[in-house]
């Protein structure tokens, strides 16, 4: 959500920050409720409350959670004499408060400069250690349990409280989530599983160092034979993260794999860093803020 006074270049800010064009925008003065359900962006949003009920507008927004809403602040200044204008102000104010609560981010724009006044907190935690991790093996699709060392280490770390818990479908992540957040419902997302290491699966460096396919892979010259293509893996993880976050307005924890964390932060992390700059140890991770475009790390776990 983007808000601010009239004539403060809120549209221009949306174009520059979110990379949308003015052709992607609908004007609340003349658009329909169906436009709200499928547009990328609505500006002059405040005028919709003159034409449609709050319940109908909320329903349309739920059907289009990716929408960017631009609304003037209309509750300031002289109180209107006309009762209908006062009711319009009141209804618009209540609706905008509801949208702000549900939004991933809220930005107030003045003179074309945006001040982010709300982000969504998010926590990333890499699963605890498995036997394969202790032996420094490539463990991707292999569905290992946590080892006792991994379980004990998780119980010693002080993790932040979270409202929503999302986990990879693999046992090492689910078991980690159950230890870290024992009283929370765990949501399983199949698209947050680790990559498939193909012919390298279950092996370690000493077993692979003389393999020419392995040398080519670590040198960035080729993909893993019979494994998941790197770009496909990254895209899968980032899409899964975004699909969760566009509906998550409360603090959300992702209990996932090291590769998943690196993939998501490579795309959304700010300032920009490379994939391997976001490596974390087992049981460790990041506390960050997501504003719909960037993940900004607040602290390390």
Give the predicted meaning of each segment.
Residues 1-31:
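Glycine-rich P-loop/Walker A and Walker A-like loops and their local beta1-loop-alpha1 context
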Residues 56-62, 94, 149-163, 242:
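A short, N-terminal amphipathic alpha-helix
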Residues 68, 163-169, 251-255:
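Short glycine-rich phosphate-binding loop at a beta-alpha junction
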């Amino acid at each position: 959500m983007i808000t601010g006074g009239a004539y403060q270049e809120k549209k221009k800010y949306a174009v520059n920050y979110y990379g949308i064009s003015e052709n992607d925008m609908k004007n609340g003065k003349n658009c329909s409720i169906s436009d709200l359900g499928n547009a990328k962006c609505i500006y002059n949003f405040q005028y919709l409350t003159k034409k449609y009920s709050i319940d109908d507008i909320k329903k349309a927004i739920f059907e289009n959670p990716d929408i960017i809403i631009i609304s003037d602040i209309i509750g300031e200044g002289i109180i209107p004499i006309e009762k209908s204008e006062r009711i319009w102000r009141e209804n618009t104010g209540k609706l905008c408060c509801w949208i702000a609560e549900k939004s991933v981010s809220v930005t107030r724009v003045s003179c074309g400069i945006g001040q982010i006044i709300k982000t969504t907190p998010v926590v990333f935690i890499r699963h605890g250690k498995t036997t394969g991790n202790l032996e420094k093996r490539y463990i991707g699709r292999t569905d290992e349990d946590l080892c006792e060392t991994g379980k004990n280490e998780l119980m010693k770390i002080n993790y932040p409280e979270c409202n929503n818990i999302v986990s990879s479908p693999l046992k090492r992540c689910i078991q980690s989530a159950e230890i870290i957040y024992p009283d929370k419902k765990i949501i399983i997302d199949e698209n947050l599983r680790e990559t498939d290491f193909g012919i390298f699966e279950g092996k370690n460096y000493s077993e692979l160092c003389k393999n020419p396919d392995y040398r080519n892979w670590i040198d960035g010259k080729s993909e893993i034979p019979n494994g998941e293509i790197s770009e496909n893996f990254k895209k899968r993880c980032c899409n899964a993260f975004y699909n969760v976050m566009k509906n998550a307005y409360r603090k959300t924890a992702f209990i996932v794999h090291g590769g998943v964390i690196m993939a998501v932060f490579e795309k959304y992390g700010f300032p920009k860093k490379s994939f391997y700059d976001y490596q974390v140890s087992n049981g460790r991770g990041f506390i960050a803020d997501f504003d719909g475009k960037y993940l900004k790390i607040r602290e390390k776990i």
